[in-house]
Structure formats: structure tokens, C-alpha cells
Amino acid sequence: MGFASCQNFQTSEVALTPLAQHPNGMLYVGMETCLECHADLVQSHLLTPHYNTSKQTTLGALENLLANSNTTVKLNDGTSLFIEKEGQQVVQKAFAPTSQEPLYAKTMDIAIGSGKKIGQTFLNWEESSLFQLQASHFNPLNQWINSPGYGSFLAPKRPIFPRCLECHSTYAQAENPSSPMENNRYVQNQIVYGIDCQRCHGPVVEHVNYHRKNPMDSIGKNILKYSQLSREQRLDMCALCHQGTLEQSNQKSFAFQPGDRLNNFRTQINTQASKQVADVHANQVALLRSSACFQQTKTMDCMTCHNPHRAEAGNRVKFNAICASCHQGVTHAPAENATLLKTSFSDCVQCHMPLQDSSMMKLELELDSLFPVQVRTHKIGIYGE
């Protein structure tokens, strides 16, 4: 990690106020600390789906979701869920078929998901316990729906365990870290929302203190650099959350740290997934591993195509250029394929990494009807029409 400039540096060590502390002693600080020397990287990262994968809700953001959308979700048992503003908060209320009084009214305290592709689901605090609410917002249709995985009836509370937050936050402090069994109780003011610098680069306190005292040293010290990691270590960093649920964890959530090997933390890892398994919570890394492009190079990893510091979804020019950097001089015979007759040959991803129906994530967009979410496969290949 290099430094473009350090315009706001401190010339002596200044105590950093930690947001939380990992059981291994690592202190988490705010990303404003990184702004001192990495302003451009931080500002671009703030716009990424990774950083926005969890956040405390604001009234303004929730009001935007209420605008021009049907804020009622009807369930098959006759229960209705209403999402409405109440004072300076937005709440979800559940009503029995003939009742005028809500069965419950719960505040929407935390948003999970960036809302860029699929949408957002919402969590509610009950003292120190965290639960998922039953109504979620589906962004493509600007529609409120029954949350994924819920039956079409008023469901019991769904607790949010650390394994959920492990992939939707940088860190969440358990109320009782020494407990042998993980539960859904947390220290509310010790959650580091979103995926920030520390999740991928490890502890930063020593790094920050060194460079505040040595602002002219342009070589990053006391920080993990991805260039120092092997390809397998780099892949494992992404596979922690992008190799899905076909694994069994044998250590507590948040135990995995950058540079660790995932097989020391997970068992039953499916490294050769079939192309049919394509889900944002499933097998991007395994699908990539099963691709000829990956198998025929010793250097390809997730960051060959993805810059984690930038929001680049839909940037066809960039992704096609990456494909072309290896596949120079490739020609197609459009007369042999009807799909090619309809394309300008400028969208490699659309044909060779097509959207596919997810077998794991389905949404109830209509009463008692499930529709699969489409996810772009990461098994690069030649597909039929």
C-alpha cells in the first residue's frame, strides 16, 4: 500500500479511539483515520457494495424506500405487514386479518445489503438482541416483499447470529465473547458496519501511528499488503464470504484474519461446484476455480477482474478489456449462433458468464409464489443460447 500524500498527518503518536476490540487484541478504528493518507481510496470505497453491505438506518434513506412503493406485504395466513413512518422512525407493523391493533411494531434499525442489485433486509434491536424483520425491500421492482427464507405466514423471530454479520460487517462485538455458543446478543456501539479497510488489511493502529510519526515514508509499514499473499491466501479472503453455505465452520465467527488459510476454519469446502450453483451466498470462488481461464494461469484471482476499492458493477468496457488482454485475436462466427447475431461482440461477460437462476435464493414477489434471483455465474465458459 503506497501513499499519494499525507496532507493531514500528525507529527507524533496520537491515541486512537477504538470502536471495538477483537478477542485476539486487535483494535478497530474508524475509516476517517485512513482518510489522512488514502483519501481517494477511502472515498471511492465508500461507494462500493462491500462498504454498504450494512449500515445503521437513517430516516431519509428509509423515506426514499417508502416513496412510490406499495408498503404493504400480505401473507398467506391473512396477516398483513405495514411499513410506515411513525414520528422520526420507520416501523414495521403486523396486523391479524380482522384486528385494528398491531401484533407488533418494530423499528428498522439496521439495513443489510447495499440495495444496488437485489435490495435490503432490515434488523431490529430488542435491547442487546438482534433480529431480522419479516419485510424486505426488493430494489428492481421498488417493492416490499416477504423476507427471503420466510414462509408465507407471520413467522417467529429470526435471530441474527455472528455468522450472518461476519459477511455483512467488519466486526460485531458479542455481548459475551467467552461464551462457547454463539448467540444474537451484541454490544450495540461496538459494531463496525460495512466491509472497511481493516477487514482486508488487518490491524491498522501500529500502521497509523508509525506513519503519523514518519509522514515522509511512502512505503506502507505495519500493514498487510495483498502483494505479500499467495494466490491461495488471496482467494481465501474472498472465499470466506463468497464460497457460500456448503461448508461447516469449526471456529467462531470473525476468527478468520487476512492471510489465514480458510481450510483451517471451514470443512467440507466444495471447490469444484457445478455451474448450476450460482448464488451470491454460494460459490463464486468455487465456480471460478472450475473455469478453464483460472486453471490455465497461475496468477488469476478475484482481483484480476474486481477492484475492491471501486464500485465497478456494469463497467463493460473494463471487464471486456480484461478478457481481451488474454484472448487477443479471438474471432466468432455469428452465422453459427443466433445469440451472436444479436450482439456487437463487445460484451464477453454477458455470453461467457451469463445470469442464471439461483437455486438457493428465491423471493416471494407475489403471494405464495417464489421466484429465483438471477446471479451471474463465475464459471467462465461457452454456454448455449
Named regions from a protein language model:
Residues 89-91, 98-102, 111-138:
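N-terminal accessory interaction module
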Residues 7-9:
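Bacterial signal peptide processing site
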Residues 34-37, 164-168:
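Short HxH-centered metal-ligating active-site micro-motif
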Residues 2-5:
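C-terminal motif of bacterial Sec signal peptides marking the signal peptidase cleavage site
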